[in-house]
């Protein structure tokens, strides 16, 4: 019998109460949805025997291997989209693969609720497996398994090697140990065009590539205008310019110049892939002195999590040198809770640990910003929660308008 009977009863009541928020076609808040997910996960832990919980957690590696194998076999695309069943023999023929092997992989996926398994040797799509019909989601799953996975698995060995005093950095850490390479992870990606293509495709998914919708760009630039010839936004490390394009789409009447800064090859790729003419470009690394000085906004999207505190501080100080008394620094990144951090955010921090970076909690962001002699004005949260927060910082001498 489960050993946590009291929790089972309490959590069941809580889930029932939260579930009523979904009745009659209502759309609950993000907070209600997150509370329901958390309570459901806690109920699963309480309902299992303690030993079963250990085995369930340990087996998640095999679950991911099954899904990755299904992607390699193209099972998601070959499964009938209308939800009708297909036999193992039929789908194996389409895959040109051994039926017994395919059946075992599909069985493992279905046990994790990816695919339905209504009858013997027959499988079908369900709501979860249909998510993988979108190619970018398959690319993301493959990217995390193939790339981050090897690095994460090396964390314990690297920690032992360093006697748990350090987890290394961008150029020497679990990633280099896991892949037996001296290259940084970005150099490793760029050395293989197909690997880089897969990475970029995975990064386009909504949960990873969401733009900075939490911050009121229009209000900030209306209160502190830069004029049509002034620099409104510099997107540092902005890749193909997706964030600037998104901001322009959301706020088409913004006045001022939009500038993309990234490595020369990245900018060349951006232009080859249709970078709009309204976006100017300037080549440079994160740590080169910024040539676009006195911009109203210096924007960093999913950049700081690449770096440890030491390099992040260097990046802040480099940007600080380009700012004036009307400049804002916007850091679009995750903000982890100091207490009760969500599991996927905590696991993402370990993903970044394996690559030599880190996700940061609110107190860690505050400490980092203040150590650079900057002022943390506000952490902006949008309706997607802490996965898509924006940290706003300014010089202590800031003369612009507050947005609170």
UniProtKB/Swiss-Prot annotation:
Record GO biological process: methylation; secondary metabolite biosynthetic process
Presence of the UniProt keyword Methyltransferase in the record: yes
Cystine bridges: none
Residues annotated for S-adenosyl-L-methionine binding in this entry: 237-238, 262, 301-302
InterPro entries tied to this protein: COMT-like, O_MeTrfase_dom, Plant_O-MeTrfase_dimerisation, SAM-dependent_MTases_sf, WH-like_DNA-bd_sf, WH_DNA-bd_sf
Record has Plastid as a keyword: no
Pathway participation: Secondary metabolite biosynthesis
SUPFAM superfamilies xref list: S-adenosyl-L-methionine-dependent methyltransferases (SSF53335), Winged helix' DNA-binding domain (SSF46785)
Primary role: O-methyltransferase; part of the gene cluster that mediates the biosynthesis of dibenzodioxocinones such as pestalotiollide B, a novel class of inhibitors against cholesterol ester transfer protein (CEPT). The biosynthesis initiates from condensation of acetate and malonate units catalyzed by the non-reducing PKS pks8/GME11356. Pks8/GME11356 lacks a thioesterase (TE) domain, which is important to the cyclizing of the third ring of atrochrysone carboxylic acid, and the esterase GME11355 might play the role of TE and catalyzes the cyclization reaction of the C ring.
Stored PANTHER family: O-METHYLTRANSFERASE (AFU_ORTHOLOGUE AFUA_2G17820)-RELATED, PUTATIVE (AFU_ORTHOLOGUE AFUA_4G14580)-RELATED
Name of the molecule in the record: O-methyltransferase GME11366
Species of provenance: Pestalotiopsis microspora
Source lineage: Eukaryota, Fungi, Dikarya, Ascomycota, Pezizomycotina
């Amino acid at each position: 019998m489960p050993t946590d009977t009291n929790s089972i009863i309490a959590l069941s009541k809580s889930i029932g109460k939260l579930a009523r928020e979904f009745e009659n076609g209502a759309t609950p808040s993000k907070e209600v949805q997150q509370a329901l997910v958390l309570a459901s996960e806690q109920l699963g832990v309480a309902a299992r025997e303690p030993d079963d919980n250990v085995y369930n957690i340990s087996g998640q590696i095999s679950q991911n291997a099954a899904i990755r194998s299904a992607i390699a076999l193209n099972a998601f695309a070959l499964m009938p989209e209308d939800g009708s069943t297909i036999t193992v023999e039929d789908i194996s023929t389409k895959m040109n693969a051994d039926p017994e092997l395919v059946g075992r992989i599909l069985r493992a996926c279905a046990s994790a609720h990816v695919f339905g398994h209504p009858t013997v040797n027959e499988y079908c799509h369900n709501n979860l497996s249909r998510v993988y019909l979108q190619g970018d989601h398959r690319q993301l799953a493959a990217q995390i398994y193939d790339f981050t996975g090897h690095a994460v698995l090396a964390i314990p060995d690297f920690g032992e090697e360093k006697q748990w005093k350090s987890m290394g950095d961008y150029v020497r850490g679990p990633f280099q140990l896991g892949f037996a390479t001296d290259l940084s992870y970005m150099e490793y990606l760029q050395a293989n065009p197909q690997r880089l293509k897969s990475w970029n495709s995975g990064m386009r998914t909504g949960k990873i590539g969401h733009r900075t919708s939490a911050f009121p760009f229009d209000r900030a630039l209306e209160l502190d205008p830069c004029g049509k010839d002034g620099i409104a936004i510099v997107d540092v490390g902005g890749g193909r310019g997706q964030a600037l394009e998104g901001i322009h789409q959301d706020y088409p009447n913004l006045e001022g110049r939009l500038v993309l800064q990234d490595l020369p090859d990245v900018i060349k790729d951006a232009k080859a892939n249709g970078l709009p003419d309204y976006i100017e470009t300037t080549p440079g690394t994160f740590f080169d002195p910024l040539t676009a000085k006195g911009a109203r906004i210096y924007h960093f999207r999913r950049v700081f999590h690449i770096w440890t505190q030491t390099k992040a501080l260097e990046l802040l100080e480099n940007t600080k040198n380009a700012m004036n008394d009307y400049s804002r620094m916007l850091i679009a990144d995750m903000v982890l809770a100091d207490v009760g951090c969500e599991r996927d955010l905590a696991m993402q921090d370990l993903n970044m640990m394996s690559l030599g970076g880190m996700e940061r909690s609110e107190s860690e962001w505050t400490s980092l910003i203040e150590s650079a002699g900057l002022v943390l004005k506000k952490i902006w949260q949008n309706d997607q929660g802490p996965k898509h927060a924006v940290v706003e910082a300014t010089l202590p001498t800031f003369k612009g308008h507050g947005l609170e």
